[in-house]
Amino acid sequence: MWESLTHGWNGLAMAWLLVAVPLWVSFSQGNAAIRQWVLSPVIALAILFGAGLCVSVLQASLNAGTVMDAAIVLVCFPLAGYFGGRYLTRSSAGNDIHKRGTRLREDTEHRRSSTRLDGGHAGQLTLAGVGVPPEDETKHFKLIGTTGTGKSTAIRELITGALDRGDRAIFADPDGGYRARFYDASRGDVILNPFDPASVKWDLFAEITNPYDVEQLANALIPAGDEGPGREWRGYARTFVTAVTRRCKQSGTHDLAELWRLLTAASSEDLLPIVTGTPAQPFLESNSAKMLSNIRSVTGSALSALEYIPAQNAAPFSVREWVRNGRGVLFIPYQAAQIAALRGLIAAWMRIAIFEAMSRPEGDQRLWFVVDELDALGNIDGLKDALARLRKFGGRCVLGFQSISQVSSTYGPGEAHTIVENCGNSLILRCSASEGGGTSRFASQLIGDREVVRAEVSHGRSHPAFLSRGGSSVSNSVTHRHVTEAAVMASQIEQLPDLTGFLKLASDPAWTRIVLTHR
């Protein structure tokens, strides 16, 4: 049977198919202009002739029998077709040759390599369908994209795997979307929002177990913010809150309503005995009435949500105690109408939790901090430094934002860029432009530039002189040019469809084009 297949027209047809099919496959995977020749027999015939010579030499040198003949033919011809096509598409005009800088790969290519390298690692998380190496988890995640592009979809995919393997998490949860998806009372999950009937009641005084905890609490409630005239007044307000809160704790007055009254409404006569002998005493001097009024204005604005907590009828709750000994997930849900009142308090709770996580013994005690709208929340004081240190204590941060300018407005340009740099895993979805480039320009710069060698083909046609013999002739020339360009232009990022973007994991040198799927 083998003899009948390999002789005459049957043999030629089989050899042609063994070369041509892999050749066409390799063409379809390339991006070169040579695709237009895919139906031409010239290339396949040339490869077929070369492969035939190699097969003849191998058969003669091995003195092969029928079975070996079949093996040589069935292996050599397809390999010659496939790799010949890959070489042609790689080297042809219209296909850039990467020299250095940012590399981009297709989603399917990365999925194949991830599967090959990780082999279905038990408990491995995925982001956009791509496996996240365990060592990358503690290098934190940033997700950049405008509304509706898929940030929440990506976070749900990532956190679903984390919770399935027993990790704990804290969500700053816009509109309660993560609560609706993940809440499980049997797991010990907790809701924290003074406006939510299902919420526990935050006990501010339970966060104070050491003398220095008062300063930490004041810093969380009234962050320093960026440089400017307001920074000094926030410093005065922290000094005032620290002094009054410490005296209340020392005297056993653990009544949040009374603390709120002292901070915002008590007379100078009531306050003076409390702050005497503290750094806040000068604020109560007779010639400092206007200064005290300004300090109270800053304090009341920053701590406004504390006014609503005493009215709750719920079990007392400590964020620090939950980080040390709690179970499940802590949800901090908020509605759009509540954000003005809760912004500072949510940021304070996240800050308390992050710094308590760094007070634990070093080790991989997996705890996720998820902030889906970093640019909508207030300043989480110390976030920049915490991102650099949390990994030693098992902390993993997932930060999503729409606008880099809004993050810069909240944290200051320098700190905002440090926060971005400290998140080693990046997912970029569609971003908006604004005057000066906006977030799309920032995202393009984040992906980076690349240098490529670009082959450019020029076509020419010459015509014979008048009355001369011969027809016109066609000439083609190829020139190679070194080009440095943005790997992904800002305008490309602005035009991305929903659920489509670019992913880079911390341990991977290349960016991957990805498509998210709803879960």
Regions found by a protein language model. Name each.
Residues 1-187, 250, 265, 273, ...:
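Accessory regions of macromolecular translocation/handling assemblies
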Residues 22, 92, 96, 134-137, ...:
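P-loop NTPase motor domains
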Residues 206-211, 387-506:
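Conserved ATP-driven motor cores of ASCE-family P-loop NTPases powering translocation/secretion/packaging/pilus
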